[in-house]
Structures are given as structure tokens and as C-alpha cells.
């Protein structure tokens, strides 16, 4: 995999390649979280709430979103659940 970078040092080139891979993985995880939230908002149910809550927790544990944002998002979903 070739990454276009200005780096000349071998370790910097490797880090640039890793950054691209990590960005793709993180973007996919965040997208899955957003999709789960949107699915719940479209049709609020206990099952979809659990799925959305789980995906929010996973994103927070991996450092994709702040812990406080995760708590806030889950609380907002819980109020929509009723």
C-alpha cells in the first residue's frame, strides 16, 4: 500500500501508512455508531436502543468519542425511548 507523503524517514513513512489504516477503521466504527443511532431514532424500540447504546459504548471505549458525549447521547436516546 503506497501512501503519498512528504516523509523521508522510514519510520515516518510507516506511521503515515498506519494513520491511513487507523483512520479507515475509526471512520467505519463511527459510521456504524451513527447508523445504529439513526435506526433507533427512526423506530424507537427496546432492541434498537440496546444496539445503539452498545455501539456508543464501543466507540467510547475505543476513544472515538469522549466518555461524556457517550453518556449524553445514551441519555438522549433513553428519553426518546420513553
Swiss-Prot record:
It holds the Pfam family Ribosomal_S20p. GO terms for biological process: translation. GO terms for molecular function: small ribosomal subunit rRNA binding; structural constituent of ribosome. GO terms for cellular component: cytosol; small ribosomal subunit. The keyword Ribosomal protein applies. Keywords: Ribonucleoprotein, Ribosomal protein, RNA-binding, rRNA-binding. Signal peptide: none annotated. The keyword Ribosomal protein applies. PANTHER family: 30S RIBOSOMAL PROTEIN S20, SMALL RIBOSOMAL SUBUNIT PROTEIN BS20C. Binds directly to 16S ribosomal RNA. Belongs to the bacterial ribosomal protein bS20 family. This is Small ribosomal subunit protein bS20. The lineage of its organism: Bacteria, Bacillati, Bacillota, Bacilli, Lactobacillales. The gene is rpsT.
Amino acid at each position: 500500500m503506497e501512501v503519498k507523503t512528504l516523509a523521508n524517514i522510514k519510520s515516518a513513512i510507516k506511521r503515515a501508512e498506519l494513520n491511513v489504516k487507523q483512520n479507515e477503521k475509526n471512520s467505519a466504527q463511527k459510521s456504524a455508531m451513527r447508523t445504529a443511532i439513526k435506526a433507533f431514532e427512526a423506530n424507537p424500540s427496546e432492541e434498537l436502543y440496546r444496539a445503539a447504546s452498545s455501539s456508543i459504548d464501543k466507540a467510547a471505549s475505543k476513544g472515538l468519542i469522549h466518555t461524556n458525549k457517550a453518556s449524553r447521547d445514551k441519555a438522549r436516546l433513553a428519553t426518546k425511548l420513553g
